[in-house]
A protein has these predicted regions:
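Tandem CBS (Cystathionine beta-synthase) repeat/Bateman regulatory domains
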Residues: 1-152
Length: 152
C-alpha cells in the first residue's frame, strides 16, 4: 500500500519548483478543536467536511493534530452500524488529547514550499500547521504541495 507521502515523493519533478512560499498555497480556513473535547465532536466534524486534519488547541495555542486516520484507529470498524459495540460508544467519549499527535512539526508562512515538502517526506506526515509567532495562520497538506508542483 502506497502512503500519501510516498506518492508525493514519487511524483515530484527533478527540478526545483518556482519560488513559492507556504503562505502562497496554504489553507487559511482552519478548523480547530480543544484538547479536552470528546471524540464524538471530532466525528461530527469529520462526517461533515472534506478535509482530514483538525488542529488541536489549548488556550488558543497549538498542542497537536487529530487526523482522520488517528480518529479511525481509535474506533472499531463497527461505528455507526447495527453491530456498533459498547467499546465504540465508550471510545467516542475519550478526549481528543488521548488520541491526537502531540507536538506536531510546524512551519512558518514565509518558508519555501520545498522546505515543507522535505518535512512532510522526511517525517512521513500528512500536514503541517502554519504558525506565525506561535499563532495558527493556516495548514499545508501533501495535496497542497502536489498541486503546487504541477498546477501552472
Amino acid at each position: 500500500m502506497t502512503t500519501s507521502t510516498e506518492m508525493l515523493a514519487e511524483t515530484l519533478p527533478d527540478t526545483p519548483t518556482k519560488h513559492l512560499c507556504v503562505a502562497d498555497i496554504m489553507t487559511t480556513r482552519v478548523v480547530t478543536i480543544e484538547m479536552d473535547d470528546r471524540l464524538i465532536l471530532a466525528k461530527e466534524i469529520f462526517d461533515n467536511v472534506s478535509f482530514h486534519h483538525l488542529l488541536v488547541v489549548d488556550n488558543e495555542q497549538l498542542s497537536g493534530i487529530l487526523s482522520h486516520r488517528d480518529f479511525l484507529r481509535a474506533l472499531s470498524p463497527n461505528i455507526g452500524t447495527a453491530a456498533e459495540l459498547i467499546r465504540d460508544t465508550e471510545t467516542l467519549q475519550k478526549r481528543v488529547h488521548q488520541v491526537m499527535t502531540h507536538n506536531p512539526f510546524t512551519i512558518a508562512p514565509h518558508c519555501d514550499i520545498n522546505q515543507a515538502t522535505k518535512l512532510i517526506l522526511d517525517h512521513d506526515i500528512g500536514c503541517l500547521p502554519v504558525l506565525d509567532n506561535n499563532v495558527i495562520v493556516g495548514i499545508i497538506t501533501w495535496k497542497d504541495l502536489l498541486n503546487a508542483y504541477y498546477v501552472k
